[in-house]
Amino acid sequence: GCCSPWNCIQLRACGCC
């Protein structure tokens, strides 16, 4: 999902990092 901890770049795009 969007907030998976192994993908900080995507987390930032989703506002989760």
Swiss-Prot record:
Key words, A-Z: Disulfide bond, Hydroxylation, Secreted, Toxin
Principal subcellular localisation of the protein: secreted
Covalent S-S links between cysteines: C2-C16, C3-C14, C8-C17
Compartment(s): Secreted
GO cellular component, one term: extracellular region
GO MF annotation list: toxin activity
The protein's name in its UniProt record: Conotoxin reg3j
Positions where 4-hydroxyproline occurs in the chain: P5
Domains as described in the record: The cysteine framework is III (CC-C-C-CC).
Domain of life: Eukaryota
Sequence similarity: Belongs to the conotoxin M superfamily.
Keyword Nucleus: no
